[in-house]
From Swiss-Prot:
<protein>
    <recommendedName>
        <fullName>SsrA-binding protein</fullName>
    </recommendedName>
</protein>
<comment type="function">
    <text>Required for rescue of stalled ribosomes mediated by trans-translation. Binds to transfer-messenger RNA (tmRNA), required for stable association of tmRNA with ribosomes. tmRNA and SmpB together mimic tRNA shape, replacing the anticodon stem-loop with SmpB. tmRNA is encoded by the ssrA gene; the 2 termini fold to resemble tRNA(Ala) and it encodes a 'tag peptide', a short internal open reading frame. During trans-translation Ala-aminoacylated tmRNA acts like a tRNA, entering the A-site of stalled ribosomes, displacing the stalled mRNA.</text>
</comment>
<dbReference type="InterPro" id="IPR000037">
    <property type="entry name" value="SsrA-bd_prot"/>
</dbReference>
<comment type="similarity">
    <text>Belongs to the SmpB family.</text>
</comment>
<dbReference type="GO" id="GO:0003723">
    <property type="term" value="F:RNA binding"/>
</dbReference>
<dbReference type="GO" id="GO:0070929">
    <property type="term" value="P:trans-translation"/>
</dbReference>
<keyword id="KW-0694">RNA-binding</keyword>
<dbReference type="Pfam" id="PF01668">
    <property type="entry name" value="SmpB"/>
</dbReference>
<dbReference type="InterPro" id="IPR023620">
    <property type="entry name" value="SmpB"/>
</dbReference>
<dbReference type="InterPro" id="IPR020081">
    <property type="entry name" value="SsrA-bd_prot_CS"/>
</dbReference>
<dbReference type="GO" id="GO:0005829">
    <property type="term" value="C:cytosol"/>
</dbReference>
<keyword id="KW-0963">Cytoplasm</keyword>
Length: 160
């Protein structure tokens, strides 16, 4: 019987989309696989990915990740033409796709990429069904975050 491999230290997260949580209310999250080329996997292993401007489009019964940027490595991609911003297919089952279509057809909803991470040896993307925030919503979130920090600071000094 073979031994299990020891877990490598470090985070499995490749990239986060912090702006999505700031600009949208995330109502539901899904985990999707990505159809990648070989050079893209090597770039992800090196951590060269940016999903800050990415979103998901639903077309012809399939979901596509649009706007994600995977910077090609110079040594890994000498024999192929690399398009860092190509549209990548998301791997979801039919039930999840139907749920996404149903949510998108409602007014004001969109699907955004939230994070890119490794799950075992597979690259996964967490996508979220989101509704845009207004400016006053962003301000109230900022006030709430500052209040949480102030509470923590007060509790820390109260124990002294």
């Amino acid at each position: 019987m073979t031994k299990k491999k020891a877990h490598k230290p470090g985070s499995a997260t490749i990239a986060l989309n912090k702006r999505a949580r700031h600009e949208y209310f995330i109502e539901e999250e899904f985990e999707a696989g990505l159809a990648l080329q070989g050079w893209e996997v090597k770039s992800l292993r090196a951590g060269k990915a940016n999903i800050g401007d990415s979103y998901v489009i639903l077309k012809d019964g399939e979901a596509w990740l649009f706007g994600a940027n995977f910077t090609p490595m110079a040594v890994a991609s000498t024999h192929v033409v690399c398009d860092p911003t190509r549209t990548r297919k998301l791997l979801l089952n039919q039930r999840e796709l139907d749920s996404l279509y149903g949510r998108i057809n409602r007014e004001g909803y969109t699907v955004v990429a939230l994070s890119l991470y490794w799950k075992n040896a597979w690259c996964k993307v967490k996508i979220g069904v989101a509704k845009g925030k207004k400016q006053h919503d962003k301000r109230s979130d900022l006030k709430e975050r500052e209040w949480q920090l102030d509470k923590a600071r007060i509790m820390k000094h109260a124990g002294r």
